[in-house]
Amino acid sequence: ETVMLITGPYDAFAHLETLYLGVLARRTRVGTNTRRVVEAAHPKQVMFFPARHDHWLVQTGDGYAAHIAGAIGVSTDAQASWWGSEGIGTVPHALIAAYGGDTVRATAKFIEHSAADIQVVTLVDFENDCVKTSLEVARAFGPRLYGVRLDTSEMLVDKSVLSQQGRFRPTGVNPQLVRNVRRALDAEGFQQVRIVVSGGFNVDKI
């Protein structure tokens, strides 16, 4: 299938060939890979958070490619600029570290300085005990908390999974960890709190 047709004297655009082929190659790769992830995750939604893993100058075009491919949001304003939107995100590990590892306090400060319409999603793996931290932030913020994000390192096993190890890979974010957090939240009446997962995800892992 033809992606682009250029008509005219070759010497008028020959010098641009490397430029436009490079743009097409990168953006179609981002778009194709994002689409595969979106389809694998369906009906769950996918957010595109690549900004920390590549050069900052590629954010705008990559974000647009991911948007076209079906990602519901991107992590920076630059990535969202071509369609007039804004970046989305979560309370980061660095902010939690700045408050001595106190996720509840860091989340409170994030809320204090955020607009009321911001959907608050906070990381809950700082202490490697996602169940405990998820419950702490849910109890502290109730309906103001939109979701918790599990981002456990691929080199670590979450505390809630230690006693359940057996016939599955226990490291990082895995289905058992997600189930543990979901059950704990539901048991205390926090069914409305969503769970966001990240870290090492690809089509096969999904």
Regions of interest found by a model, annotated:
Residues 4-188, 203-205:
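Buried, small/hydrophobic-residue-enriched core segments of structured protein domains
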